[in-house]
């Protein structure tokens, strides 16, 4: 994601670090094959995580989350407003919220079974909420005895679900509006379809691209720390 922040900055200012007229698919494929570039960006992420963690719980992690989480919500809202106001974005909203619409309109061949839905949602739930990983034991060791655990648990679940819905509203409407044939899932949705969307927004596209990929960087760093 740091790579794509740099890419959009390059496109915004016409610098050499931009896409330089290459197709988004070629940019993504080239990055996957470029081991040196992957190592560099990986090290940048590791160093960034280390610097935050070295600040301790209150001076590093809490300070970052205190700034990063509000910034994440602001960037999400900006991207949602832009995505949902694009011509054709309504099809993305129908895909997300209208049962049977995707099958009826040929977006997907057939609806997944209830067991597939439960399996996918359950896997995401366990991963997103860090259930069964021992993470809560680690976090719990830093909590004050006056903390209301039940209230915090409910709040975490509600906010996690809200952010997931907001992320969907940020991505899916844009895909249907500006890249209707783009991938609907996996890394290609993030790095090919969404970059296509930003490339087709015109002059403001790189700005929204920078905001979007910074948003993903914030989310990744908050998970890594």
Language-model regions, residue ranges each:
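Inter-helical loop and helix-membrane interface segments of multi-pass membrane transporters/permeases
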Residues: 1-58, 87-119, 184-191
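Alpha-helical transmembrane segments in multipass membrane proteins, preferentially the mid-helix core
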Residues: 48-52, 137, 225
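Membrane-embedded translocation segments of transport machinery
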Residues: 62, 66-223
